[in-house]
Amino acid sequence: SQPGARVGVLGHTRWASVGIISEPNAHPVNSEELESAADAAYLVAALNGDVDNHADLRARHELRLAQPITTDAKVIPALVSRSLAKGATLPEAFRETVASFDGSVAIAAASAEQPEMLLLALKGSGQGLCVGLADNRFIVASEPYGVVEETQHHSRTQ
């Protein structure tokens, strides 16, 4: 045990609703692009739902994503990283990115630069997040399974 040590884990099981079922499309996805700047912010994100305008966002922002990555989720960390490079704070960059989406989404994201902050978003209808609080940890899921068993207090947002 190390006093003050923290561990952040972000995982997600998702059947591909956009993109093929493949390891490169597995969540969480990271913010890396083919030609990322050396000082680009590193983020990861997991998505439940669909970013309906992901192809338009890729083109408009000229995202340079590796060819085998076809999931719509990849635009989340890539766009947040781009916004951070322009001087936005992490919460501002995340809000701006989510606001640009068409579709219904539930998102969890984290940044290497601010590991103490977990970013959560809901947009559209049909998605939800269950947030559970327990001693020294919190658990977030799109369904209550696992959350209610592991936490003393939980709430579902829709």
What role is predicted for each listed range?
Residues 1-158:
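Conserved short alpha-helical segments that host acidic/polar catalytic motifs at enzyme active sites
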